[in-house]
Amino acid sequence: MHVQPTKYHGLVLDLMPNIRLMQGFGHFLFRYVSGPVLIRKLYSWWNLIMILLQYFAIMGNLVMNTGDVNELTANTITTLFFTHSVTKFIYVAVNSEHFYRTLGIWNQPNSHSLFAESDARYHSIALAKMRKLLVMVMVTTVLSVVAWITITFFGDSVKNVFDKETNETYTVEIPRLPIKALYPWDAMSGVPYFFSFVYQAYFLLFSMCQANLADVMFCSWLLFTCEQLQHLKGIMRPLMELSASLDTYRPNSAALFRAASAGSKAELILNEEKDPDTKDFDLNGIYNSKADWGAQFRAPSTLQTFNDNNGMNGNPNGLTKKQELMVRSAIKYWVERHKHVVRLVSAIGETYGAALLLHMLTSTIKLTLLAYQATKIDALNVYGLTVIGYLVYALAQVFLFCIFGNRLIEESSSVMEAAYSCHWYDGSEEAKTFVQIVCQQCQKAMTISGAKFFTVSLDLFASVLGAVVTYFMVLVQLK
């Protein structure tokens, strides 16, 4: 099958660097490609098989070395660490259609001419933050892989073995490899050793990048959502000033249509002396589906008119028909854009909620075992650095989810405050009703949950961190 190149829009275009990296590291995302898909599918399946073979080798080492408690704990931590990568790799493959649907929600970024400047500005802010997040996470991942491989050459390459006959623990030399694994060949030296080393280096880089790139896409969705909420809050005050022109006398109505887009000094609407042809007013840029606008044109009574009996314009501010339609469509734009954001948040939760649940279940067990291992640190040696590295990396992964989930809660809950803080009392009756509805709808903050079991926020991170610290202190006291 050969896919022709297409022009991308919306979130797909914004997240294209992330998507290309995910495809490069073997993720099963074949929709946004050009050229033969069969080769990409074979490449993804080859990566999956190689990742699973190494993961099974790690699990085999865990099963074969259960005699010593310290060795068992260390091998369990390593297995759980790479469980994140395997589960997310398979999760993205199984739920690829959900990823496509979420990415496609914003494929038609319709805007309003009055607020186009504000929309473009917050979109550029979101794009810059998403690119910065991607670069930071990828650099951190590569540095972590380099550090992991480097520390392999320090210290003794041994493992603890428990002798049941003598009830003693002794050390056995093992291959100096980044990861303890069980292979069907002797990897102590020669070609098998070099092959095993290169294989594990590949496994480290690809598995960690596969997991982190999926997490970055999730966080990028939340970043984009938060900036859209910022845009909606930013245009609330100009929206109220616009609505006030419908039925409230204002001395300088011509100035009303200036600086309506977050401080812009550009004139947005010309105050024409005579009514323009209403056909010149194009509504296609403002959520132009028939379901949105058809009801209004079928029921003209929903639009107020200001013409007197003589057919003259009776609007107290002298607004033309075009300006009246523009003002009314601004309120509709805000509502439809907010509903669009709500749909995006719902799709994000459905797409990645189960992955968050699996991540937190694995991390809870892993962090508990790391707290136990941390009690045995007596010096800043290879063992101490390894445990600290595991601990910091695991907490950073959880923090990455929680910080963006918490920001979504803050931004969505502050929409009601922004609506109440604007000059709604100077607006039209329609605007006052609009603000009342906004306050009612935004009382409950938007959240992302882990398959309905927990809410992703800083409170979750504080709970996890508090549990780890508490367990660590208890173990120190028992020791």
Curated annotation (Swiss-Prot):
- Asked if Transcription regulation is a keyword of the record, the answer is no
Consequence of gene loss (knockout): RNAi-mediated knockdown results in significantly lower blood feeding rate in female mosquitoes. Lack of sensitivity to all tested odors in antennae of female mosquitoes. Lower preference for humans as hosts for blood feeding.
Q: Which UniProt keywords apply?
A: Behavior, Cell membrane, Glycoprotein, Membrane, Olfaction, Receptor, Sensory transduction, Transducer, Transmembrane, Transmembrane helix
Q: Report membrane topology.
A: Multi-pass membrane protein
Q: Which InterPro entries match?
A: 7tm6_olfct_rcpt
Q: Where in the cell is it found?
A: Cell membrane
One GO MF annotation is: olfactory receptor activity
GO CC terms of this entry? plasma membrane
Q: Where are the transmembrane segments?
A: 44-64, 74-94, 134-154, 188-208, 345-365, 384-404, 456-476
Glycan attachment sites: N167
Intervals, Cytoplasmic compartment: 1-43, 95-133, 209-344, 405-455
Give the UniProt record's GO annotations in the biological process aspect.
Answer: signal transduction
Keyword Electron transport found: no
Q: Which residues lie on this side of the membrane: Extracellular?
A: 65-73, 155-187, 366-383, 477-479
Q: What is its main location?
A: membrane
Tissues expressing this chain: Expressed in female antenna, maxillary palp and proboscis. Not detected in male tissues.
Q: Which family does it belong to?
A: Belongs to the insect chemoreceptor superfamily. Heteromeric odorant receptor channel (TC 1.A.69) family. Orco subfamily.
What task does this protein carry out?
Odorant coreceptor which complexes with conventional odorant receptors (ORs) to form odorant-sensing units, providing sensitive and prolonged odorant signaling and calcium permeability. Orco is a universal and integral part of the functional odorant receptor, involved in the dendritic localization of other olfactory receptors. Required for detecting a host for blood feeding. Plays a key role in preferred attraction of females for humans over non-human hosts for blood feeding.
Task: Summarize the subunit comment.
Answer: Heterodimer with conventional odorant receptors (ORs).
> What is the recorded name of this protein?
Odorant receptor coreceptor
Give the species: Aedes albopictus
Q: Which gene encodes it?
A: Orco
